[in-house]
Amino acid sequence: TSFNSFVWDLNKYINVFVYTFKEKTTAGISHLPYTPRENSLPGLTANNHYFSNMPSYTHCISINNTYITEDDVYTTLAHELGHYLGLFHVFSEQECNETDYCEDTPNYDRNAYTEWLGTLTQPYNFLEVVKRNGCEGESFISTNVMDYFHSYQNRFTANQYSRVRHVLENSPLIPGPKNIITTKVAREDIVPAARAIE
């Protein structure tokens, strides 16, 4: 189902849709942003097409209303907003060979962590399960919003902040102050074409 008829102006709003997913164990999903070719960001697609064209798909964040609970709706929304604004997971799912392009976020093997969780007896000791063994041999407490359970999920790092700021200032289809005039997308059904670029 396309939600394009429900989408508000992507230059002014981040569209969040809440509905029942076919995939029952997914809490949320999000589109990643584009960056201009002239000012790209590692890991994100450089595409100038959306500076002057609206996408044919629904560029948004989606939250699963059957899987999400009252306890984690806030962290799920914050996590999906992180993706929408250019952030990746702070872990690897293929041993330790993935990156989030942020030097100040320790990486760890999520599959190894999940296997370790399977050896524990429930209920878990939260102070034990928030610990991670990093890919460089270090131990740390998981606090990053871009991690999965079990984590405090209440922090971003300086490098993550820089990535988000870059996206806000340079990317099409993202609200926020822009560094260049071409990052505003014309939407004639909302703003007349002559005034669409601010």
Segments the model singles out, each with a brief description of its role:
Residues S2-S92:
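Active-site-proximal segment of zinc-dependent metalloprotease catalytic domains
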